Amino acid sequence: AIGADIHMAFDELTAPLAARGTIVKAMQRTHAWAERCLVRHDELNAEHLARGENLQALYGVVQGARDETLRRHSANFLGERNFDGYGIGGVFQPGEIADVVSWVCETLPEDKPRHLLGLGSQPADLFLGVEYGIDTFDCVAPTRQARNGALYTFDGRINISNARFCEDFAPIDAECDCYTCQHHTRAYINHLFRADEILGATLASIHNERFVVRTVDQIRASLLDGTFFDFKQSFLARYYGDDLPIGVTL
Protein backbone atom coordinates (compact mmCIF):
# COMPACT_ATOMS: atom_id res chain seq x y z
CA ALA A 1 0.00 0.00 0.00
CA ILE A 2 2.82 2.45 0.75
CA GLY A 3 4.80 1.42 -2.32
CA ALA A 4 8.11 0.52 -0.68
CA ASP A 5 10.84 -0.38 -3.17
CA ILE A 6 12.26 -3.04 -0.82
CA HIS A 7 10.50 -4.82 2.00
CA MET A 8 11.48 -7.62 4.34
CA ALA A 9 9.63 -10.88 4.88
CA PHE A 10 8.35 -11.36 8.42
CA ASP A 11 10.92 -12.84 10.79
CA GLU A 12 11.18 -13.62 14.48
CA LEU A 13 14.10 -12.17 16.37
CA THR A 14 15.39 -14.03 19.43
CA ALA A 15 17.57 -12.87 22.28
CA PRO A 16 21.25 -13.65 21.60
CA LEU A 17 21.49 -15.95 24.63
CA ALA A 18 18.12 -17.69 24.17
CA ALA A 19 17.98 -21.48 24.51
CA ARG A 20 18.81 -23.33 21.30
CA GLY A 21 15.32 -24.83 21.15
CA THR A 22 13.82 -21.34 21.23
CA ILE A 23 16.16 -20.20 18.47
CA VAL A 24 15.27 -23.22 16.31
CA LYS A 25 11.53 -22.61 16.67
CA ALA A 26 11.95 -18.94 15.83
CA MET A 27 14.02 -19.80 12.77
CA GLN A 28 11.45 -22.33 11.57
CA ARG A 29 8.68 -19.78 12.05
CA THR A 30 10.75 -17.24 10.13
CA HIS A 31 11.11 -19.71 7.26
CA ALA A 32 7.38 -20.47 7.22
CA TRP A 33 6.57 -16.77 7.16
CA ALA A 34 9.13 -16.23 4.40
CA GLU A 35 7.43 -18.74 2.13
CA ARG A 36 4.00 -17.21 2.78
CA CYS A 37 5.37 -13.72 2.14
CA LEU A 38 6.96 -14.86 -1.11
CA VAL A 39 3.66 -16.29 -2.41
CA ARG A 40 1.78 -13.08 -1.62
CA HIS A 41 4.63 -10.96 -2.97
CA ASP A 42 4.45 -12.73 -6.33
CA GLU A 43 0.68 -12.19 -6.44
CA LEU A 44 1.05 -8.48 -5.72
CA ASN A 45 3.83 -8.04 -8.26
CA ALA A 46 1.62 -9.66 -10.90
CA GLU A 47 -1.00 -7.02 -10.11
CA HIS A 48 1.61 -4.25 -10.29
CA LEU A 49 2.79 -5.56 -13.65
CA ALA A 50 -0.75 -5.67 -15.03
CA ARG A 51 -1.23 -2.03 -14.04
CA GLY A 52 2.11 -0.95 -15.45
CA GLU A 53 3.48 -0.11 -12.01
CA ASN A 54 6.98 -0.55 -10.64
CA LEU A 55 7.70 -3.93 -9.08
CA GLN A 56 8.71 -4.30 -5.45
CA ALA A 57 11.63 -6.32 -4.10
CA LEU A 58 11.21 -8.80 -1.26
CA TYR A 59 14.10 -9.90 0.94
CA GLY A 60 14.14 -13.05 3.05
CA VAL A 61 15.64 -12.58 6.52
CA VAL A 62 18.29 -14.99 7.81
CA GLN A 63 18.07 -15.80 11.52
CA GLY A 64 19.78 -18.32 13.82
CA ALA A 65 21.36 -16.15 16.53
CA ARG A 66 25.04 -16.97 17.19
CA ASP A 67 24.79 -20.62 16.12
CA GLU A 68 26.85 -21.29 12.98
CA THR A 69 24.92 -24.44 12.03
CA LEU A 70 21.56 -22.66 12.29
CA ARG A 71 22.80 -19.57 10.49
CA ARG A 72 24.11 -21.59 7.56
CA HIS A 73 20.92 -23.66 7.49
CA SER A 74 18.77 -20.53 7.42
CA ALA A 75 20.90 -18.95 4.70
CA ASN A 76 20.73 -22.12 2.62
CA PHE A 77 16.95 -22.46 3.08
CA LEU A 78 16.26 -18.89 2.03
CA GLY A 79 18.94 -18.91 -0.66
CA GLU A 80 17.08 -21.70 -2.43
CA ARG A 81 13.97 -19.48 -2.67
CA ASN A 82 13.60 -16.78 -5.29
CA PHE A 83 13.97 -13.71 -3.11
CA ASP A 84 15.29 -10.50 -4.61
CA GLY A 85 17.83 -10.18 -1.82
CA TYR A 86 18.50 -11.22 1.75
CA GLY A 87 18.51 -9.52 5.11
CA ILE A 88 20.67 -10.66 8.01
CA GLY A 89 18.89 -10.14 11.31
CA GLY A 90 19.79 -10.69 14.93
CA VAL A 91 23.34 -9.32 14.87
CA PHE A 92 23.56 -7.31 18.08
CA GLN A 93 27.21 -6.36 18.50
CA PRO A 94 30.01 -5.34 16.13
CA GLY A 95 32.07 -8.20 17.56
CA GLU A 96 29.59 -10.64 16.01
CA ILE A 97 29.86 -9.28 12.48
CA ALA A 98 32.97 -11.18 11.43
CA ASP A 99 31.55 -14.57 12.39
CA VAL A 100 27.82 -14.29 11.72
CA VAL A 101 28.05 -12.28 8.52
CA SER A 102 30.81 -14.43 7.07
CA TRP A 103 28.85 -17.65 7.80
CA VAL A 104 25.77 -16.25 6.10
CA CYS A 105 27.46 -14.57 3.14
CA GLU A 106 29.48 -17.70 2.36
CA THR A 107 26.17 -19.57 2.04
CA LEU A 108 23.86 -17.08 0.31
CA PRO A 109 23.80 -16.70 -3.50
CA GLU A 110 26.57 -14.40 -4.69
CA ASP A 111 24.37 -12.64 -7.25
CA LYS A 112 21.81 -11.27 -4.76
CA PRO A 113 22.26 -8.25 -2.46
CA ARG A 114 22.83 -8.75 1.28
CA HIS A 115 21.39 -6.28 3.77
CA LEU A 116 22.51 -6.03 7.41
CA LEU A 117 19.53 -5.16 9.55
CA GLY A 118 19.78 -2.60 12.34
CA LEU A 119 23.55 -2.36 12.67
CA GLY A 120 25.51 0.78 11.89
CA SER A 121 25.74 2.63 15.17
CA GLN A 122 29.36 3.56 14.48
CA PRO A 123 31.56 3.83 11.37
CA ALA A 124 33.43 0.61 12.18
CA ASP A 125 30.20 -1.34 11.58
CA LEU A 126 30.13 -0.17 7.97
CA PHE A 127 33.70 -1.25 7.30
CA LEU A 128 33.24 -4.63 8.98
CA GLY A 129 30.00 -5.30 7.14
CA VAL A 130 31.47 -4.46 3.74
CA GLU A 131 34.62 -6.44 4.45
CA TYR A 132 32.58 -9.58 5.09
CA GLY A 133 30.16 -9.22 2.18
CA ILE A 134 27.38 -6.77 3.09
CA ASP A 135 25.95 -4.47 0.41
CA THR A 136 23.49 -2.27 2.32
CA PHE A 137 22.63 -1.29 5.89
CA ASP A 138 19.88 0.34 7.90
CA CYS A 139 20.19 1.81 11.36
CA VAL A 140 18.44 4.46 13.45
CA ALA A 141 21.64 5.33 15.34
CA PRO A 142 22.85 8.32 13.27
CA THR A 143 19.65 10.28 13.87
CA ARG A 144 19.02 8.94 17.38
CA GLN A 145 22.52 9.89 18.45
CA ALA A 146 22.17 13.25 16.71
CA ARG A 147 19.04 14.03 18.71
CA ASN A 148 21.13 13.52 21.85
CA GLY A 149 23.94 15.77 20.65
CA ALA A 150 26.38 13.05 19.58
CA LEU A 151 27.87 14.14 16.26
CA TYR A 152 30.28 12.34 13.95
CA THR A 153 33.46 13.98 12.74
CA PHE A 154 36.37 12.44 10.90
CA ASP A 155 38.40 12.89 14.08
CA GLY A 156 35.87 11.05 16.23
CA ARG A 157 32.50 11.62 17.84
CA ILE A 158 31.79 14.77 19.84
CA ASN A 159 29.03 15.81 22.23
CA ILE A 160 27.95 19.18 20.89
CA SER A 161 26.19 20.03 24.17
CA ASN A 162 29.50 20.26 26.04
CA ALA A 163 30.49 23.67 27.37
CA ARG A 164 33.71 23.71 25.33
CA PHE A 165 31.65 24.33 22.18
CA CYS A 166 29.81 27.41 23.52
CA GLU A 167 32.23 29.78 21.79
CA ASP A 168 33.53 27.47 19.06
CA PHE A 169 32.68 29.17 15.78
CA ALA A 170 34.02 26.44 13.51
CA PRO A 171 31.70 24.05 11.67
CA ILE A 172 30.99 20.65 13.21
CA ASP A 173 33.52 19.17 10.78
CA ALA A 174 35.59 21.36 8.48
CA GLU A 175 35.71 18.58 5.87
CA CYS A 176 31.94 18.08 5.74
CA ASP A 177 29.82 19.48 2.91
CA CYS A 178 26.41 19.08 4.59
CA TYR A 179 23.96 21.97 4.95
CA THR A 180 24.62 22.23 8.67
CA CYS A 181 28.38 22.53 8.34
CA GLN A 182 28.11 24.96 5.43
CA HIS A 183 25.76 27.33 7.26
CA HIS A 184 26.14 26.96 11.04
CA THR A 185 28.80 26.78 13.75
CA ARG A 186 29.40 24.47 16.65
CA ALA A 187 28.52 27.35 18.98
CA TYR A 188 25.12 27.81 17.34
CA ILE A 189 24.30 24.09 17.46
CA ASN A 190 25.45 24.04 21.08
CA HIS A 191 23.09 26.94 21.83
CA LEU A 192 20.17 25.15 20.17
CA PHE A 193 20.69 22.04 22.28
CA ARG A 194 21.09 24.03 25.48
CA ALA A 195 17.89 25.94 24.66
CA ASP A 196 16.13 22.66 23.85
CA GLU A 197 15.25 23.89 20.36
CA ILE A 198 14.07 21.16 17.98
CA LEU A 199 16.09 22.80 15.21
CA GLY A 200 19.22 21.54 16.96
CA ALA A 201 18.16 17.92 16.53
CA THR A 202 17.24 18.59 12.89
CA LEU A 203 20.57 20.18 11.99
CA ALA A 204 22.48 17.52 13.91
CA SER A 205 20.59 14.75 12.09
CA ILE A 206 21.35 16.32 8.71
CA HIS A 207 25.03 16.29 9.58
CA ASN A 208 25.18 12.71 10.87
CA GLU A 209 23.25 11.35 7.90
CA ARG A 210 25.56 13.12 5.47
CA PHE A 211 28.60 11.82 7.34
CA VAL A 212 27.39 8.24 6.95
CA VAL A 213 26.54 8.68 3.26
CA ARG A 214 29.93 10.26 2.56
CA THR A 215 31.68 7.44 4.38
CA VAL A 216 29.85 4.82 2.33
CA ASP A 217 30.63 6.75 -0.86
CA GLN A 218 34.31 6.68 0.09
CA ILE A 219 34.14 2.98 0.89
CA ARG A 220 32.60 2.33 -2.53
CA ALA A 221 35.32 4.34 -4.24
CA SER A 222 38.02 2.45 -2.34
CA LEU A 223 36.53 -0.87 -3.46
CA LEU A 224 36.56 0.26 -7.07
CA ASP A 225 40.18 1.38 -7.01
CA GLY A 226 41.43 -1.51 -4.86
CA THR A 227 42.39 0.54 -1.79
CA PHE A 228 39.67 -0.61 0.63
CA PHE A 229 41.97 -1.98 3.33
CA ASP A 230 44.28 1.03 3.21
CA PHE A 231 41.27 3.35 3.45
CA LYS A 232 39.80 1.32 6.30
CA GLN A 233 43.05 1.54 8.26
CA SER A 234 43.49 5.29 7.78
CA PHE A 235 39.83 6.13 8.44
CA LEU A 236 39.43 4.05 11.59
CA ALA A 237 42.83 5.04 13.00
CA ARG A 238 41.88 8.69 12.67
CA TYR A 239 38.34 8.26 13.99
CA TYR A 240 39.06 6.00 16.97
CA GLY A 241 42.73 6.54 17.73
CA ASP A 242 43.80 3.83 20.18
CA ASP A 243 40.21 3.14 21.30
CA LEU A 244 39.09 0.67 18.64
CA PRO A 245 35.72 -1.07 19.19
CA ILE A 246 35.61 -4.76 20.08
CA GLY A 247 36.09 -6.95 17.03
CA VAL A 248 37.79 -4.24 14.96
CA THR A 249 41.38 -4.52 13.78
CA LEU A 250 43.39 -2.27 11.50
Listing of model-derived features with the role each one plays in the protein:
Residues 1-51, 163-166:
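Non-catalytic, usually N-terminal nucleic-acid engagement modules in DNA/RNA processing proteins
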Residues 35, 39-42, 106-109, 194, ...:
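Generic secondary-structure signature for well-ordered alpha-helical cores
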Residues 11-17, 175-250:
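C-terminal extensions of enzymes
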Residues 22, 26-29, 70, 204, ...:
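Alpha-helical initiation/capping and key positions within long helical/coiled-coil segments
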Residues 15-20, 24, 84-89, 198-201:
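Glycine- and acidic
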Residues 26, 30-33, 37, 74, ...:
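Alpha-helical packing segments of well-folded alpha/beta enzyme cores
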Residues 28, 40, 44-48, 53-172:
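Glycine-rich phosphate/ribose-binding loops and adjacent secondary-structure elements
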